[in-house]
Amino acid sequence: MDYQDTLTYLYNSVPMFQQVGGSAYKEGLENTLTQDAHFEHPHRSFRSIHVAGTNGKGSCSHTLAAILQEAGYRVGLYTSPHLVDFRERIRINGQPIPEEYVIRFVAQERGFFEPLHPSFFELTTAMAFRYFADEKVDVAVIEVGLGGRLDCTNIIRPDVCIITNISFDHTQFLGDTLAKIAGEKAGIIKSGIPVVIGETTPETKPVFLEKAQTTGAPIYFAEENDREDYPGIEYELKGLYQQKNARTILTALPLLKEAGYRLDGQAVRSGFARVVELTGLMGRWQKLQDSPTLICDTGHNVGGITYITEQLKQQAYRQLHIIIGMVNDKDIRGVLALLPREATYYFTKASVKRALPESELQELAEAAGLEGHCYPDVPAAVRAAQEKSLPEDFIFVGGSSFIVADLLANRDALNLY
């Protein structure tokens, strides 16, 4: 099999949450532990940092990886989902896992995986851990896939755990209250390992405190951190929510130093200032066009869209155009209620099975007072917005990671940079 054949095999032979949603979710660590034993516990050969949370965990993971790279470490980075290429999920010092490694791993191990029937995420986690061990990384930044307690990344014993925040998402698996969701994400907290909590609410803070107390884990709240260890940092990531992510990271850095990491001010500043270049991060308030400005962002739940709408209010423009699509298992009405009514809307759908049909989204949006037209795919919606926009207008593309993925996959055809 070549690389495309291998991806087709992966996408079709194991259930992929990105495509089918809940039916791909496998609760429990039985498969993970079986895989870990088969591959001889590769995660034990490298140090790690574990990052969970409803929103912001991808940005935090990439920024931490960038800082560690600039400090001279060989850094593995495991995140999800990917936007354009599967290999984005697994990187070392910003470079995606080689196609040849993916091909070889699947060819050699399919006989092991097929009787096990792992999920797509279980299989890719095994691939990532094996790759990081084979390539002898010094440290890996590991982003939780979903939740925490039963996530298949939760076999690692990291130097530091981070939980960015708690909002409503994946409630069918994690619970229908913030406290229940916090309880699942607090499952990554382990005995004696310091944990940083990025944001809390009155419902979630007691959950974290109790878990830290019962496990004997030192706990630190970024909201209470007023230290200025690195004054004058320039942040490449411009989303409003990145300010909270930065405080979370800055709270974690002293704990990493205590764990023996060498992190000087230059590495920290360079990591924050060059995270996109160093790690390949995409889709976070990413600018793709001037005159009119076109911005995309992967925020896709009430928590993420809240920050996006606040940032849209700060932009200067003649007319706002919003290209939006969502998947069918999100709080669609909750998101639509947050969006500005004065914008012109372009309702579309992503090229995944979970995508909500654009006509259904338009119907729900009209009930929320949002006016616009339907387009069959993201490129068609973007072209329509480009044609209707004047240079002083502002185009926003989002509502789902998969909408952003389709946008980025077609950026050349759409004359975007």
Task: Give short role names for the model-derived ranges.
Residues M1-G53, C60, A66, E70-A71:
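Short functional linear segments
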Residues G22-L29, T34-R44, E70-I156:
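ATP-dependent carboxylate-amine ligase catalytic core
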Residues T54, V75, V141, T164, ...:
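Residue-level signal for inorganic ion chemistry
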Residues P81, T124-F173, K205-E234:
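Extended acidic/charged loop-beta regions that coordinate divalent cations
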Residues V139-V144, C152-I162, S167-H170, Y230-T344:
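Nucleotide phosphate-binding/pyrophosphate-handling subdomain across enzymes
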Residues V160, F173-K180, K185-I188, I193-P254:
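Internal gly/pro-rich beta-alpha loop/helix module
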Residues T200-Y220, T293-L294, V302, V335-F394:
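C-terminal helical cap/extension that packs against the catalytic core
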Residues S400-Y417:
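Glycine/aspartate-rich loop-and-adjacent alpha/beta segment that forms the canonical ThDP
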